[in-house]
């Protein structure tokens, strides 16, 4: 069955679950501010960056299917016709024997995403399928041990990815799945596989669960303990394991001794370990006062799939403008190919985004929210010092630039600078409405304006 059908099923199931704002994963209904000054400082630095990349890469990339979820026994899952559940699982686990990214080139990734104007990165060290993209000593189900890439000098993939991005000034983030469907202490083979959660009662098998907690703490210790350098973000997925059930309160103090100010993102789990919220594949309806990030895909899926349908550069820029005007950041999902490169179609779009940001990035980076933040397709940000206002016209796909831009409130003082070409124009104000006449010759792209307020 084609991957797009599976993705559609996932979206329909999630959107029908009663989430108020139509997120694939509903964001937490509250926020607890950190008390550690180093974490608060790191969060403020992260909020300056605005634009990052979230890379899913693993066994699912080999056939180009949805990441891990075909293993799940949820009702929405669609597997190839005629395959049995157990047969499918064995086929999927067997992908570990053929995953061989011989063209693995993290330096190319770093170049591409730097050129796109991205400032932070998050890499999947382990997804729900349990396949580790780092050299762990606690399971052989890893790229460093299970298949042909185990003989490659770059077999500790996460290390080489992080090392490629650090010299370029990226904040470094490690994605880690709290559930592990390959681990016998999570899905124990004695029982049939339940849906996404553990398939046994902890009250009957407390030792199994304790083994799983120890296993998870050990792996998180490997990632955060210094072997992979200082981390800026620990991005934990699988919020259906709730609270502190995997020992985060024990892990984080040691992790923050190695990486002071480490931002912990315990997704969808309201509490002190969710340092920023992560609405998925959607944007909150209004501004949020707390730190947050929309994680959204460039295509339709997180991992690489054949013949992807990518968003246009114009669409991504408009999305970024809306997100930043509402106080958030954008983590854009781009999945490397099975052999280890970023495909050319994605590179072309990312280059276009980066070219716009090099001219207009002042309107995005190092900005904060302003009270009047939206007027139709125009989104407003203000500089961190509160002195300069920015207006971004998010030109919709398929449309040409209008001759004028108009909005209410946010009245300019003096001339308005068009960041796209550096030219200054006058703004006229009548009955509280601002009108800016655009000069001829501008490209059909989002327009960023800079001005001071009266």
Model-derived regions, located:
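Mature catalytic domains of secreted/periplasmic carbohydrate-active enzymes
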Residues: 20-454
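Hydrophobic h-region of N-terminal signal peptides that target proteins for export
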Residues: 10-18
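Short, surface-exposed linear motifs at loops/turns and structural transition points
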Residues: 7
